[in-house]
């Protein structure tokens, strides 16, 4: 008898909030959005694949000041009756502190990170913006890790695929999740920060590589169209409602 595909679910976790008073300062290299103010959210995600769990991004640390979440990922997982040691994989979109802040709380997880970012973390000196401290456990050989040079089919059945989308950082990744009932989802990481720059292929002035960013946006949008996927821009609070409110999971 053919083995059935394990159930896959997707749950949004709150990993911080912040108001950006003028997004024209950093989030465009073409002088767009003059004086525009936007709220940002910092979203993380729990992916359940059968009996296995994966985290996508780990948000701000609890000591990050005003942007920090009110409840840690560990405590949110406890509400779902999931223990830190049950997390098998942690996929990191990129090495910035607002996506890696709570990574040290999951030393037993296998880290999945783009090779360009891993190389930037290990460089001397490390690349600007890399939250090196969060990766110490894996840098010292204490945990399993894989530096991804291409896409990664995490569970081997095409239900969760980390997609290479460089540009924001050299090893930036996004992720695709296929759900039986809710359909396909594409989570951006920081490929785009809000709808206005996603729609216009806008590039933040602090991105690592402009050309790679634009090419990654093109790839991501074509994939979204072909998959008829729901696109979730992780920093845009207008996209929070695309998934059920915590603790409910999309299935």
Predicted regions and their residues:
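Active-site metal-binding loops of divalent metal-dependent hydrolases
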Residues: 15-16, 58-61, 95, 116-117, ...
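Short Gly/Pro-enriched turn/cap motifs at secondary-structure boundaries
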Residues: 34-38, 163-168
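Histidine-centered catalytic micro-motifs
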Residues: 90-100, 165-172, 233-237
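Short, electropositive alpha-helical surface patch
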Residues: 64, 72-74, 110-112, 167, ...
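Active-site metal-binding motif and surrounding structural segment of the metallo-beta-lactamase
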Residues: 66-113
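Metallo-beta-lactamase
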Residues: 1-82, 86, 182-189, 225-230, ...
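Cap/insert and terminal regions of metallo-dependent hydrolase folds
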Residues: 174-176, 181-251
């Amino acid at each position: 008898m053919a083995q059935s595909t394990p159930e896959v679910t997707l749950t949004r976790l709150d990993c911080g909030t912040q108001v950006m008073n003028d997004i024209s300062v950093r989030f465009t290299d073409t002088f767009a959005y003059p004086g525009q103010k936007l709220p940002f959210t910092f979203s993380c995600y729990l992916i359940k694949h059968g009996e296995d769990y994966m985290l996508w991004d780990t948000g701000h640390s609890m000591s990050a000041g005003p942007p920090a979440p009110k409840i840690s990922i560990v405590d949110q997982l406890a509400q779902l009756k999931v223990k830190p040691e049950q997390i098998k994989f942690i996929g990191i979109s990129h090495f910035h502190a607002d996506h890696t802040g709570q990574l040290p709380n999951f030393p037993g997880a296998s880290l999945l990170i783009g090779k360009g970012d891993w190389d930037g973390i290990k460089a001397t000196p490390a690349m600007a913006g890399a939250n090196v401290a969060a990766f110490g456990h894996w840098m010292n050989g204490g945990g399993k890790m894989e530096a991804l040079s291409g896409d990664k089919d995490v569970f081997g059945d095409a239900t969760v695929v980390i997609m290479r989308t460089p540009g924001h950082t050299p090893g930036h990744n996004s992720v695709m999740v296929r759900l039986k009932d809710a359909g396909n989802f594409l989570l951006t990481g920081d490929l785009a920060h809000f709808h206005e720059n996603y729609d216009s292929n806008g590039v933040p002035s602090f991105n690592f590589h402009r050309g790679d960013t634009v090419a990654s946006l093109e790839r991501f949008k074509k994939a979204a169209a072909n998959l008829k996927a729901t696109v979730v821009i992780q920093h845009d609070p207008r996209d929070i409602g695309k998934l059920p409110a915590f603790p409910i999971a999309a299935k």
